[in-house]
């Protein structure tokens, strides 16, 4: 039921964004399409905690933006993307007593992601700069993964990896239990628009995962295992129409 409630909140949030178009203001009808690319810096929010470095990966895909209204000084738009993103985690490995080990482990996970964003901007619509914020739900679907493990692999007396709180079950994962994931994303950025309908944007975002990649039942090891992502992105759009 928890996942159903979370999904209902996301759906309500998105339909609230759509209602922006119904506000009283100066009507706009501008559709821009293009491409985006950048970097994703990811960790997994594990409970019990696993100490990690930032996992670095690429993120790129297609972007679409529909500008529907200018409400006083606020330019209102809906933005959707379909992106290929490299996520995962990279462990900072300690032994059961908290001492650093030479062991290394990294899990690379590839996703197709669909952010559906409300975009509010202030500044020039063409021929200048515009500041904007983004907020909305994001959905993802797992495609594949791979692991990188050092030749040095420290074991305890029972033959298991020597780790804090005896937590090592993450190494047994071949694929996540839950391939579909969702959460909330938000960010801010700057856009430069030409007078000929071309737009270059740079933004930074934070994604907070609401779903777990591993099962979290009473008999499972992890109570939580969700993606947490900081990303930086460059986007190029050109207007298909501007009415």
Give residue ranges: language-model regions:
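N-terminal hydrophobic signal/anchor transmembrane helix of membrane proteins
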Residues: 65-77, 85-90
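Hydrophobic, well-structured mid-protein blocks that either form specific transmembrane helices
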Residues: 102-144
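Short loop/turn motifs that connect adjacent beta-strands in outer-membrane beta-barrel proteins
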Residues: 23-31, 69-76, 123-130, 194-199, ...
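Predominantly the C-terminal beta-signal and adjacent terminal strand-loop region
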Residues: 28, 181, 186-243
């Amino acid at each position: 039921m928890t996942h159903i409630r979370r999904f209902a909140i996301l759906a309500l949030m998105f339909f609230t964004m759509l209602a922006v178009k119904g506000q009283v203001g100066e009507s706009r009808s501008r559709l821009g399409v293009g491409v985006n690319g950048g970097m994703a810096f990811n960790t997994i929010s594990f409970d019990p905690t696993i100490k990690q470095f930032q996992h670095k990966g690429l993120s790129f895909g297609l972007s679409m933006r529909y500008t529907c209204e200018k409400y006083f000084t606020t330019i209102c738009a809906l933005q959707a993307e379909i992106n290929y993103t490299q996520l995962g985690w990279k462990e900072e490995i300690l032994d059961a007593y908290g001492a650093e080990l030479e062991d290394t482990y990294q899990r690379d996970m590839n996703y197709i992601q669909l952010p559906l964003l409300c975009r509010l901007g202030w500044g020039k619509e063409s021929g200048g700069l515009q500041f904007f914020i983004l907020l909305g739900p994001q959905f993802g679907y797992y495609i594949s993964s791979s692991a990188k493990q050092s030749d040095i692999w420290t074991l305890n007396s029972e033959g298991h990896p020597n780790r804090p709180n005896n937590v090592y079950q993450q190494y047994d994962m071949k694929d996540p239990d839950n391939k579909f994931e969702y959460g909330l994303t938000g960010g801010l950025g700057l856009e430069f628009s030409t007078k000929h309908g071309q737009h270059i944007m740079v933004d930074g975002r934070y994604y907070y995962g609401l779903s777990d990649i591993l099962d979290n039942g009473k008999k499972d090891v992890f109570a939580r295992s969700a993606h947490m992502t900081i990303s930086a992105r460059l986007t190029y759009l050109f207007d298909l129409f501007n009415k």
